[in-house]
Amino acid sequence: MSGTEQAADAGQVVAEYWAAAEARDWGAFGALLAQDVVYEVPQTRERVSGRDAYVRFNAEGFPGDWHLAVQRIVSQDRAAVSMIEFSEAGASQHGLCFFDLDEAGRIVRITDFWPDPYEPPAGRAHLVSRY
């Protein structure tokens, strides 16, 4: 498989991952994961190891009527990065996820970041516009 084909496959796997999560299709979600998948959130230092534990974490760890929309996926070889918008009860936040795939094309590592918005330093207000 060429690097171009691998890049397309990694991006497609990540798109399928988010589609399964949005649909709460935990069987399809789990099928995309390697048995030894590791999920980490550096900001909270949480780690979930193993497919069954990670599927359970998602199925039980996020109750409520939430939704997500993929904003962007960038992939290369067996790696991909996604940016999503996660919405629940009128509030939303963005998530950045880094994915690594194994040789079989299953997700083996996920590193998840949830950046919080913040006010910029006042000293540079004259150098930027706000949106």
Report each predicted region and the residues it spans:
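C-terminal and inter-domain tail/linker signature
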Residues: 1-131
